[in-house]
UniProtKB/Swiss-Prot annotation:
PANTHER family documented for this protein: RECOMBINATION PROTEIN RECR (PTHR30446:SF0)
GO BP of this protein: DNA recombination; DNA repair
Family stated for the protein in its record: Belongs to the RecR family.
Gene giving rise to this polypeptide: recR
Domain Toprim: 81-176
Organism (species): Flavobacterium johnsoniae (strain ATCC 17061 / DSM 2064 / JCM 8514 / BCRC 14874 / CCUG 350202 / NBRC 14942 / NCIMB 11054 / UW101)
A Pfam family recorded for this sequence: Toprim_4
Protein name, UniProt field: Recombination protein RecR
Entry's Gene Ontology molecular function annotations: DNA binding; zinc ion binding
Function comment: May play a role in DNA repair. It seems to be involved in an RecBC-independent recombinational process of DNA repair. It may act with RecF and RecO.
Zinc fingers, C4-type class: 58-73
Domain of life: Bacteria
Keywords, alphabetical: DNA damage, DNA recombination, DNA repair, Metal-binding, Zinc, Zinc-finger
Keyword Lipid metabolism: no
Amino acid sequence: MEFSSKLIEKAVNEMSQLPGIGKRTALRLVLHLLKQPKEQTGFLSQALLNMREDIKFCENCHNISDTKVCEICANSVRNHQTICVVEDIRDVMAIENTGQYKGIYHVLGGKISPIEGVGPSQLNISSLVEKVKSGKVVEIIFALSSTMEGDTTNFYIYKQIAESEIIISTIARGISVGDELEYADEITLGRSILHRVPFEKTFKNN
């Protein structure tokens, strides 16, 4: 792709680094921004800078937050004895949009994947185990994607907390194998949470 301006070329190259954005789409976005008032582009740039510099991760659940503790964990109305274990922040957003879950979350930051070189030590697993050991947790709900990596991660965590006297469940398999939670429709995802099943049944029946 040829550019008549090095500035445009640099902007397109940076924009195309975003997931799902190719060079042609990046060019359309850059040209759109070029047509906008300078202050509008400034607002966008400042918003992105503020997000990158000031965003925090909740010290309790690892969700994104503007403060040390996220709004969900700080909400005394939520059920703090039930923890929904998810892969990343997009899953928190997807589940929250269902309006069916009233507990809190624990964001792992990924899933175990030997192929990609991701092991348990690179995920937020130890802090979850510590929460269970504290004796304040009644139920853990696994809500990872139905993939080999997701199932491996679930089973690894299960082995770490199996001896504790808590309920360990997983969302019902209303979501197709291999699907990510963020792409599930709200009704299906909401039902899968409400109709969650004991985790032991998922591997004893296999």
